[in-house]
Amino acid sequence: MLKIENLTKRYKGDEIALKGVSLEIKKGQVVGLIGPSGAGKSTLIRCINRLIEPSSGEVWLEGVNLPSLSRTKLKEARREMGMIFQEYALIERLSVMENVLSGRLGYHSFWRTFWRRFPEAEVERAFYYLERVGLIEHYNKRADQLSGGQRQRVGIARALAQEPKVLLVDEPTASLDPKTSRQVMRLLLELCREKELLAIVNIHDVPLAQAFMERIVGLRAGEVVFDGAPSELDERALTEIYGEEEWKTLQKTHQEESSLGEDSSLLYAKAEIAG
């Protein structure tokens, strides 16, 4: 279980990015974070694994309060937390396989990783995850030769190669077209179910979140203003999360995408799941 208690992040100049956020997420649960730009979604994800240091509050993972850990202990704890980034965060000049194996860096000494001497079992595991994400034939290709969707799949394989208990996913579809976005979300959900992973997914596309997430948390100005099932995310709740004007703009954007044949609606995503 992941338990977040009264988590707050203040920046210089008294800017408050998170205001007393409290959440409990069970093993195997996939939670979507939605909200307007600047709501604190990415900050929350990064405060959990301390890529950003929280100002106050607690983050408990398997009985350990992460903000209280020393750097050495934090490195060990981060083995349990896989991260998937919006901009992929791949090393462009390295091969797909080398990027996936970089997910094991937290388990080995500097020199072993420098010379890329990974145990055979870890190489086999990397091949397994490349097969699961549909990139086994590209294992020796440089990362900069891949499409956006393929790069995100490498990022997923790398995170899973850690054998984590938690997946922290920051805008995995922001740079992808609607069809590829649905494919990536479907893959993420399948792998989380297969591994019983707890996952938090920061996602900008509301219909996509409604289709794929089992629980949705809405943030506005650093505070939780909605926490419930996708079926409870009605017009009133969405207006509370985004504000009336921004929600109208988002609705218009989704309608325009649909009219162009790039529909990212709930029906299409559900069809993708069922298919």
UniProtKB/Swiss-Prot annotation:
Residues that bind ATP: 35-42
Domain spans labelled ABC transporter: 2-246
GO molecular function: ABC-type phosphonate transporter activity; ATP binding; ATP hydrolysis activity
EC number per UniProt: 7.3.2.2
Membrane topology, from the record: Peripheral membrane protein
CDD domains assigned to the protein according to its UniProt record, in alphabetical order: ABC_PhnC_transporter
Main EC class the enzyme belongs to: translocase
Keyword Cell membrane: yes
Major site of localization recorded for this protein: membrane
Short name of any one Pfam family annotated for the protein: ABC_tran
Cross-referenced InterPro entries: AAA+_ATPase, ABC_transporter-like_ATP-bd, ABC_transporter-like_CS, ABC_transpr_PhnC, MetN_ABC_transporter-like, P-loop_NTPase
Reactions catalysed, as given in the entry: phosphonate(out) + ATP + H2O = phosphonate(in) + ADP + phosphate + H(+)
Compartments in which it is found: Cell inner membrane
Family per similarity comment: Belongs to the ABC transporter superfamily. Phosphonates importer (TC 3.A.1.9.1) family.
PANTHER family found in the cross-reference section: AMINO ACID IMPORT ATP-BINDING PROTEIN, PHOSPHONATES IMPORT ATP-BINDING PROTEIN PHNC
NCBIfam families membership: ABC_phnC (TIGR02315)
Complex and partners: The complex is composed of two ATP-binding proteins (PhnC), two transmembrane proteins (PhnE) and a solute-binding protein (PhnD).
Annotated protein name in UniProt: Phosphonates import ATP-binding protein PhnC
Source organism phylogeny: Bacteria, Pseudomonadati, Campylobacterota, Epsilonproteobacteria, Campylobacterales
Gene this protein is translated from: phnC
